[in-house]
Amino acid sequence: MTIQLSVNVNKIAVLRNSRGGTDPDVLQAARTCIAAGAHGITVHPRPDQRHIRAGDVLALSALTREHAVEFNIEGNPFAPPRAGYPGLLELCRATRPEQITLVPDGDGQLTSDHGFDFAQDTTQLAELIAAFKAVGSRVSLFVDAGNPDIAGAAALGADRVELYTGPYAHAHASGQTDTALALFADAGRRASAAGLGINAGHDLSQANLGDFLAAVPGVLEVSIGHALISEALYQGLEATVRAYVDILRGSQVGA
């Protein structure tokens, strides 16, 4: 089975919002990604609306349903609603995405940079996971590869984990990948042993994706945004998505 590519279109919205108006068109960019072979679209609507907004979520939900590809909504389940942001649970109830990825990021974070700590009180998180699953979506939790209790995600009711791959990307850029890959491979094995599906994302790129997938068993899906959109500035969006799909086809699940 081919590992799935979900393209994160947040950066398209960042560019649009920097100028105001509707260009570049997030919906058209997503359409291009799907036509080029992307298996899904990811968004991370934040309470400060710095990129993806509630209206984008609704429109992209309709688009992905029309094209029969998966919609993945990321977000902090603890962030309260505020003006323009109805809250993650309400957005998911309105759109019923195939997957909801819960991320423990604060309002002031530039980007997601750590996973959940299952050593903390997780009663509220378990209740929220149950609420998100009641929407009809599978639930994935953002985790660090070094988390000693990745199996705790299964105990909380999650279906998958998304391995935070930022540390791997940094190690790859410095040419020091062996230790990082061993850590992620171990995390993948522990997740699989707990019955969890494995996703991966953050700073994955054409340069480092193949090595990661060759070393980490059982990855089902990668979510890629920043690097893909950056590369598309030089290579074109359609060609860039196709290049990622080619990498994934060469890295079959279970291969």
Curated annotation (Swiss-Prot):
GO BP term (any one):
pyridoxine biosynthetic process
Report the EC number(s), separated by commas if there are several.
2.6.99.2
> May I have one GO cellular component term?
cytosol
Q: List the disulfide bonds.
A: none
Catalyzes what?
3-amino-2-oxopropyl phosphate + 1-deoxy-D-xylulose 5-phosphate = pyridoxine 5'-phosphate + phosphate + 2 H2O + H(+)
Say which domain of life the source belongs to.
Bacteria
Q: Which UniProt keywords apply?
A: Cytoplasm, Pyridoxine biosynthesis, Transferase
Q: Which InterPro entries match?
A: Aldolase_TIM, PyrdxlP_synth_PdxJ, Pyridoxine-5'_phos_synth
**Where does this chain mainly localize?**
cytoplasm
Q: Give the EC class as a word.
A: transferase
Which parts of the sequence bind 3-amino-2-oxopropyl phosphate? N8, R19, D203, G225, H226
Q: Name one GO molecular function term.
A: pyridoxine 5'-phosphate synthase activity
Role summary? Catalyzes the complicated ring closure reaction between the two acyclic compounds 1-deoxy-D-xylulose-5-phosphate (DXP) and 3-amino-2-oxopropyl phosphate (1-amino-acetone-3-phosphate or AAP) to form pyridoxine 5'-phosphate (PNP) and inorganic phosphate.
Could you say which protein family the record assigns here?
A: Belongs to the PNP synthase family.
The protein, known as: Pyridoxine 5'-phosphate synthase
Organism phylogeny: Bacteria, Pseudomonadati, Pseudomonadota, Gammaproteobacteria, Lysobacterales
